[in-house]
Amino acid sequence: LVGYGHVGHALAARLVALGARVMVYDPFVHNVTAGVEHVCLEDALGCPIVSLHASLHGDYPHPSQNLIDSTRVGCIRDDALFINAGRGGLVTTGALLDLASRGVTLVIDTWPGEPKISAELVSKVALATPHIAGYSTNAKINATDYLIDSLVSALGISESEVRADVTDEVPMVLDVSGLSRVDTPARVDTPARGDTLAQIDALTKLNALDKAISAVSCIVEDDAHFRRVWQSAPVSQTFESLREHYRLRHQISDLRVTLSEPRPDLVQILTAAGVGHVH
């Protein structure tokens, strides 16, 4: 992870809970939580999965503008998964095109030069979204609550007069019996049929995570919509419109999962992933 601010810290905690080895680069942070390793930028970029979450600034001695350029891009492995969900200006378009030419899998939410982004780059990334950032139903509710608190304080009125009850829960029944099938979307590498029980167990957990996450936000559908609209008019206004009219979606914490049969291991991994309730 490049950046250990609010988002980077929360993501690191989630990944550690899921059993991942997490390395973090952030020159402004000197203490990290248990299970997280603080490393130099080159070591962070050398990981199999690299995800950017740093703020964008030009302040020395550690400017982040164009942090990953034609020089540092060489630190990234050819077989890596590279995600930018931080700021578009953290990496140059040239660096991303270089990565794509080497076979690196690119998942891009924040783009260099946005809203005027590279059509060539869009065609080369595995998953593309229009700077969704923290947009969700929960974010809208929280922002509204913040305004309500100020309104109540300023006008001296009762919260009950202005605050409405909003149900955020998303119920889901998960059929455990079908989770060991190799039917996970092609974007995920899975073991073949007949592999060891340990691999089948891992596949079951992977499928459970995939179905749970897709129940609240399907990035494959977001990617398809982005490409369809963008290709019809690849201009700045299209990108801005996609951001402004992004569909409402829930967060995984809203999900309430009922398993079709008792599986403590699935309860553990779904809870670690942030599912609100599993039983």
Label each PLM-derived region with a short phrase:
Residues V29-A119:
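Rossmann-like adenosine-cofactor binding region
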Residues A186-D189:
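Charged low-complexity "KEKE/polyampholyte" interaction tracts
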Residues V22, V50, A126-A128:
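Short, well-ordered beta-strand core segments
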Residues D79-F82, G86-T184, D195-L266, A273-V278:
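Rossmann-like dinucleotide-binding domain for NAD(H)/NADP(H)
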